[in-house]
Amino acid sequence: MAATGKPIVVVGGGMTGLAAAYYLRKFAGDAGIPARVTIVEASNRLGGKIETLRKDGFVIEKGPDSFLARKKAILELAADLGIDDELVPINPSGKKSYIVFRGKLHPMPDGLMLGIPTEIAPMLRTGLLSPLGKLRAGLDFVLPARKGGGDESIGAFLTRRLGREVVERIAEPLLAGIYAGDLDRLSLMATFPQFREAELRHGSLILGMRRAMRRRPAAGADGSPAARAGAEAEARSAASGNGAERSGAEPHAPSPADAILARFRGAPFLNFRRGLATIVEALERELAGADWRLGRRAVALRKGGAGDSGARYAVVLEDGEELAADAVIVTAPAWEAEKLLGDHVDCGMLRNVRYASVANVVLAFDKASFGREFHGSGFLVPRAEGRQITACTWTSSKWLHTSPPDKVLLRCYVGRAGDEDAVSLPDDQLVRLVRRDLEELIGVTAAPEMTEITRLHRSMPQYPVGHVEAMRDFRRRLAEALPGVWAAGAAFDGIGLPDCVRQARETAEAAIREWRDIAP
């Protein structure tokens, strides 16, 4: 790109920011618009929460561990980058998952979709619910739908439809785990709007989700937030009938993503053979001609370009440097976005997006001394169990590429909204607490050969009730106050990697459209 091209600044070097910068350069080139892209990242590394450790034959994800296969935005990006041949599916024999109840692992009942039962017999047989709890869940078939619109919490909605027992023992560990959140505070319409749609369309949440289950192959869910987030998106697409696979949708030519899905037919989640850092590294290579400001924090946005540049805006860095910009894409967390934009537009809704802190504790064992075989991919721990770990993925069982054949790799999750103290414990104490839970829950007494702890402070956005309307209003006022400035990322419209890529692409497209509209 020409150094004298139209200047654009992307604030944030995580998945959304890198993908936005990539698509800006791509779309600008396709449109014949010279563009000069600068990426500003406060830390000294790229990728945001994505970080892969490759060590001694292990491939260890320190952040997210996979992404939903059916959300095509990230597959299209992988194909564009030429890394789709590096994709790997989960182990087909490692899909079974469990829920802890009263200190014991219980198989997740068949027919669950996001914690919502779609088959009667498995729910009648499960030991997770009492007879009264099962009867209460059955009232969903006769209870009328709530009248009126408006948002409500996930917890309030599910309690109304299925009863508190189902919520606390089945739905909460699965759904709340996606956001490391509190179901009684998280927005229904920002997280699982398909639940409300099922209620309105079918008069029953169970019947609505049963139809969704029959339309799509079950995604399954294990202990990982990525798997839970993937299951959420899978069900959302199925229940709402969105996408080209919807009955009655017009046919379209197969895309690169369609070819990838055909290759991994039935695999709900994907990763890369050398870890998720593969896509970050590929984006960095493609952006070699961009300008970088690593370890430099953007602290202000000023109308009027830097110096005599004639640009619309100046992005001010903490060391005083000013970057001229005709367009700015802010992909930073909500509190950082508020600092940049708050002088120009009301950012109260960004202050309402609070963040939970979590930790990942990875333990590697020698298989010969481990003492047991795993048949499945992991387990979930309800909040009511009072454990330190919220979930555990049997990583070497779920992802065959992650460890040598003579080793066992486990990944445990600690921390959720309102229960985050353990995240900040010293390493030895945190490992001790995790090992205690593993011993009591699954009988693991062997000492790990290696541990790897990652603390992700303020990493999980908590969408409050009313989030969708608040963000729609915020974006409208942002466009009015600061034309050519956009905000995207996990704080706004979906926390999964595919959602971040989708937002990045949509924002880049909007920027190119605006440039065309205002071109003389």
Describe the role of every protein-language-model region.
Residues T16, R45, W335:
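Conserved Rossmann-like nucleotide-cofactor binding loop
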Residues R25-K55:
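Glycine-rich FAD pyrophosphate-binding loop
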Residues A73-D110, R161-E168, E286-L294, V299-Y313:
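Feature captures the FAD/FMN-dependent oxidoreductase FAD-binding
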Residues A2-T16:
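Beta1/beta-strand and adjacent pyrophosphate-binding region of the FAD-binding site
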Residues D56-A145:
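Dinucleotide-binding Rossmann-like beta1-alpha1 core, especially the glycine-rich loop
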